[in-house]
């Protein structure tokens, strides 16, 4: 079973991100489940959503405590909440920012992690440019798809199409395509740095 935990704030589409991820996995023939965990339910409050993906029926219903991947929609949570709790050294991390992990003050933390499983994506910037709103979820899911290979960009795009009206979906798919290419380019840089 592959488990994903998504951190963000109310109003950023955290729950929708988990739902779209589960739809994308389902479209690829997997079993999937998505659900949120709310603190105080207000715009701007920290929100966590979870997604599990497996080939077999999923019977677990509790929050994801040992994620295989973490998607962080709001980088201001990095030093306020233990967003990395339970992540294994083999885990994937996708953060919504144009800054590097070092610039975020995470250089020491990531030293024990696999660099090829870490990326940042300027998802809010992409959403503002292509969607006209600061909702980074579609771009981050595409970034996750590029980084992990667990789902395809085509499935992410189809899931976006299922969640949003046509015009909004098209704009989000554009942001997702740009984010996917962004992460692939970042990954090439990591590969060159490791072999160089």
Language-model segments: which ranges?
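Active-site cofactor/cluster-binding pocket
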Residues: 1-196
């Amino acid at each position: 079973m592959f488990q994903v935990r998504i951190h963000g704030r109310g109003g950023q589409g955290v729950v929708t991100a988990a739902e779209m991820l589960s739809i994308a996995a389902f479209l690829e023939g997997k079993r999937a489940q998505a659900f949120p965990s709310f603190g105080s339910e207000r715009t701007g409050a920290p929100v966590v959503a979870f997604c599990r993906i497996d080939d077999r029926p999923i019977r677990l219903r509790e929050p994801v405590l040992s994620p295989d991947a973490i998607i962080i929609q709001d980088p201001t949570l990095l030093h306020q909440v233990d967003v990395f709790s339970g992540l294994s050294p083999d885990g994937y991390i996708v953060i919504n920012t144009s800054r590097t992990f070092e610039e975020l003050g995470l250089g020491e933390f990531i030293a024990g992690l696999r660099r090829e499983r870490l990326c940042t994506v300027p998802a809010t910037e992409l959403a503002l440019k292509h969607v006209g709103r600061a909702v980074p979820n579609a771009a981050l899911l595409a970034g996750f798809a590029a980084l992990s290979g667990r789902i395809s960009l085509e499935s992410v795009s189809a899931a976006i199409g299922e969640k949003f009206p046509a015009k909004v979906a098209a704009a989000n798919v554009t942001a997702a395509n740009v984010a996917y290419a962004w992460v692939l380019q970042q990954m090439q840089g990591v590969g060159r740095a490791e072999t160089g």
